[in-house]
Regions:
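N-terminal glycine-/serine-/threonine-rich phosphate-binding loop
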Residues: 1-48
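Active-site-proximal beta-strand elements of phosphoester/diester hydrolases
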Residues: 12-24, 113, 125-128, 145, ...
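Active-site beta-strand/loop signature of hydrolases that rely on acidic residues for catalysis
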Residues: 15, 30, 38-68, 90, ...
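CN hydrolase (nitrilase-like) catalytic-core segments centered on the catalytic cysteine
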Residues: 78-98, 153, 162-279
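Short beta-strand scaffold segments in enzyme catalytic cores
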Residues: 99-101, 113-116, 144, 260-262, ...
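Short, glycine-anchored, charge-dense loop/turn motifs used at functional sites
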Residues: 112, 116-123, 263-270
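A short, polar/charged loop-to-alpha-helix boundary motif
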Residues: 128-142, 277-295
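Cysteine/selenocysteine-centered motifs that mediate thiol-based redox chemistry or coordinate metal-sulfur cofactors
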Residues: 153-177, 181-183, 289-327
């Protein structure tokens, strides 16, 4: 683990997390939404604002695109227009911004990527480790942990990356005090009969006439209740803050459930939104909660010499794409 005490560190950090309904393929509209939220976050004194997975390009419709269509939507990083705009926005408003889109990599390879733009002009990119959205989108092969200007250390894991406990632990062991966790989740098709499942689009379309019905879906087993089965444990067991951002509303043939929230190192929800629409929450992180959090204590009791079998294939591993689309 990287010792935190050796790095200059602000005692508190104000963060913002956003949920919004991305428009498929409409990067201009989606960036305009992002820019409006950045202005609001900066006005409220946030030093970090987190946006959802693939919020610039759109998400679930990607699986139906041809390779040519995907290539027309994807952009290189750091030389593409969305990267440059995000970088300029971070510098203009003196705030760190995280946002996602489809990256055009080398040799015709694509990635589900997330860029963190710092106000000093620096950039960090995370490629989703467990990507499944399109046959041409390949998973990344590196963990991403970075230093924020305020001295805090943050890691990035995209959606399915957070499902695997090993990924969060490895991020924590690299010194992450904050996990930036952009998602497009909730309301998903699944073979599990006890959680998730598709939300009837008519309920979403009638959300103003019947707000109680959509609230029950977003907060129930297809949304927040499912998140509460596992998301707090990622923060608690690894002694870190978790900034969860998500899509909300129509995402091709599914309905995303929002519930943008921030959790502390004890797995407690510091602030969240239950709004059935675009929304942002802002809260302060207290570094004083980190050193004696249960997860930090547990990690100091690790016995690494016992854990070599974790890196040995069992023969039961499958591609995440096969697992996802066999559901």
């Amino acid at each position: 683990m990287i010792p935190r005490k050796h790095r200059p560190h602000a005692r508190t950090l104000r963060v913002a997390t956003v949920q919004f309904e991305s428009q498929p393929g409409d990067k201009e509209s989606n960036f305009a939404t992002l820019e409006a939220f950045v202005r609001k976050a900066a006005y409220q004194g946030a030093r970090l604002v987190v946006f959802p997975e693939c919020c610039i390009t759109g998400y679930w419709f990607l699986r139906n695109l041809t390779r040519k269509q995907l290539a027309g939507l994807a952009e290189p990083i750091p030389d593409g227009p969305s990267t440059r705009r995000l970088q300029a926005l971070a510098q203009q408003h003196d705030i760190t911004i995280g946002a996602g889109w489809v990256e055009a990599g080398r040799a015709g390879v694509f990635h589900n990527s997330y860029v963190v733009a710092l106000p000093d002009g620096r950039l960090h990119r995370h490629r989703k480790l467990h990507a499944f959205e399109h046959p041409a989108i390949e998973g990344g092969a590196e963990f991403t942990v970075l230093d924020l200007p305020e001295g805090w250390r943050a890691g990035v894991l995209i959606c399915y990356d957070c499902n695997l406990i090993e990924n969060v632990r490895l991020t924590a062991l690299q010194g992450a005090e904050i996990l930036i966790a952009p998602h497009q989740t909730g309301g998903c098709r699944t073979r599990n009969p006890h959680l998730m499942g598709v939300i009837d689009r008519r309920i979403w379309e009638r959300r103003r006439e019947d707000p109680g019905a959509i609230r029950r879906e977003l907060r129930g087993e297809k949304g927040r209740a499912w998140l509460m089965r596992w998301l707090p444990s990622r923060a608690h067991d690894n002694g870190l803050f978790l900034v969860f951002s998500n899509g909300v509303g129509v995402d091709d043939d599914e309905i995303r459930t929002g519930n943008a929230m921030v959790l502390d190192p004890y797995g407690r929800v510091l602030k969240e939104t239950s709004r059935a629409g675009d929304a942002m929450v802002v809260t302060d992180l207290d570094a004083g909660l980190l050193p004696d959090s249960t997860g930090q204590v547990w990690m100091r009791a690790r016995r690494p010499e016992l854990y070599a079998p974790l890196a040995v294939p069992t023969g039961r591993e499958q591609s995440v794409r096969k697992l996802k689309f066999s559901e």
